[in-house]
Amino acid sequence: MDDLDYKILSLISNDARISFLEVSRICNVSGAAVHQRVQKMMANEIITGSEFWLNLKKIGYQTCAFLFLHFSETTNLDRIVEKLKDIREIVECHSITGEYDIFVKIYALNNSHLYEIIQNQIKPLGVVRTETLMSYKESFHRQFVFG
C-alpha cells in the first residue's frame, strides 16, 4: 500500500458511488491505474465489497438490540457462528473476551419478534446465559473512513 492506494481508499470509502474516472481525475492518474489498484485491494481483501445500507426502521424493523451470549459448550463456537449466520436478523457477530462468548447486533420487527428469535433460534444453539441491551436511538452509523 502506498500513498495513492490510501488516497483511493479515502475517496471510495467516503462515497462508494464515486466513479473510477472521478477518482482518477482527483488523483491525477489514469482510470486504468485506479481500476487496477482497486482490483488488487479487492484481491488482497483490503476492500471486501460495496453495498447500500438500508434504513431498516423504514421497512418495519423497529427494534435494534445487542445480545451478549454465553454458551454451555465453547469448543464449538465456530459451528455456532455458522448457525448464527443463518439468522437473517443478525447483522453483526463478534467473538469476545470476558464473561460472554459472542456479541451480536440484531434487528427485529418489534420486541415480540426479538423474543421469538432469541427463544426459537438462538437459545437452542446451547445458550446458557444472555444479556440484552436495547437501542432506543442510533446516534450515527458509518463505515470507517480514511482521510
Summary of predicted features, one role per range:
Residues M1-G147:
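A compositional/biophysical signature of low hydrophobicity enriched in polar/charged and small residues
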